[in-house]
Structures are given as C-alpha cells and as structure tokens.
Amino acid sequence: MTTTNDTKIKTGLVLEGGALRGLYTMGIVDVLIENQLHFDGLIGVSAGAAFGCNYLSRQPGRVLRYNQRFSHDWRYCSLRSWLRTGDLFGAEFAYHHVPQQLDRFDFETFKTSPTDFYMVCTDVETGRAVYQKAEQEMSIDELCEWIRASASMPLVSRIVEIGGRKLLDGGVSDSIPLRYFQEIGFQRNVVILTQPRNYVKQPTSFMPLMRLALRKYPHMLSALMHRHEMYNAQLRYLEEQEKLGQTLVIAPERKLKINHTSHDPA
C-alpha cells in the first residue's frame, strides 16, 4: 500500500497476551497466514509473542497442536512444574524442548520473513517496558529466552535475566503496545485482544503476595499496582484510534471459556 507520494504505509499486527486465551488469537492469525495477508511488523506481549512468532514461521495450526498434545504433561504447565522449578510453564521443556525437538518451530522461515518481530517484556528494576526486536543474528535459544521473559507471569515464574536486564511479563508495563508501534512507524494496525470489548480490568487481588515475592523491586510493584489503570487507558486509546480509521480491533464477543492455564485439550 502506498500514499500519493509513494511513501509506503507500514502495517502492524499487535497481539495482546493472556496466557492460553492466546489460542483465540492464534485462530485468527492462522487465518491470516492461510490467506497470505502480510504485515510489515508484529509485536507480541506474553502469549502474543510466544504464539505470534508462528506468523513469521508460517506454521498455521502449530500452536493449537502442541497445546493439545502437551496439555497433560506436567513439564509443560503444572503446579508440579512450579513447585519443582519455579516456573508454571516449564522454562526448558515449554520454551526449548518443544520448539526445537518435539514440535519443531521453523526458525529458518522465521529468520527470512519480511515481517519485523518485536517482543515486550517488563524490566523488574525499573517497572518499564522493554521492546526487543528479533535481530537477524539472534539464535533460536536467544529468541526463545526473550519470548519466555515476555511471558513470565509474576508469582508463577522466575525472573529471566537476558540482555543485561531482569525481566518478567510484558503485560505488566505495556499490555496493548499499539502506541509504541505507531511511534516507530507502523501507521496502520490490526490489534487482536483476548478480552471482550466491554472488559474493564480491576486491581489485582494478589498484591500482598506480589509485595512479598517482589519486595526488592519497588518499581515493579508500582507497575503491578497501577496495571489496571494502564490497561483501561489503553482500551480508551484503542477506541480513539479505531475512530480515526487507521486501527482495526478484533476481540471476542464474550468472555472466553478458557483460563490463563488449562489442561483440557478440547
């Protein structure tokens, strides 16, 4: 797509997180792949990054397939994994063993994709968002670690140290990074949410536990405390941008019948 002066309008795909609610997102992304719809950039938060990378590797159906296959494997996601390793979603099994051995992620196709791929994490020492682009020289292990950092939910995940930073779930600091994508040049965007349009985020009920687990990181605690305010403000911004005609928002009509974690392969 071009403007009258032949300046290309860059298109972006913005994927919210939501753990296994991201399966809704991937149903839509699979359709985009199958219909060969191209975006210049994709930015994913948490599950949006973990699942959205398959848009670049052109592997429709892969996310649903491996989630169904490993839904009852304690190494993938379980209380047992959390108690034994500190991670609800197994760091080694889910983020390395599955994509590199059991249900291979097509890293070569990912690397040659013309679509830029960005992951959002939260720096626990500053409480601010970190936006990491998948550079050409990045190895599959490094990519998987950045994705793991983006998807590492507080309380049920260990802090991920990478790139000289201590990182956790990107949704804490920038749940719907449309504004960031616009600022770096993606003018026309499709945003896929995992909550219905009438959703209003409430303050977390886990702050007492957060204060205990993250007591060394006051800026992270502040971000967690105000996360609902940030999120609801982003929803208002989405509405404004949608009215301007440069943003298309796709969201479920009603609350999805799936929790953050699920062991039901159906």
List the model feature ranges, each with a label.
Residues 1-45, 53-266:
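Patatin-like phospholipase
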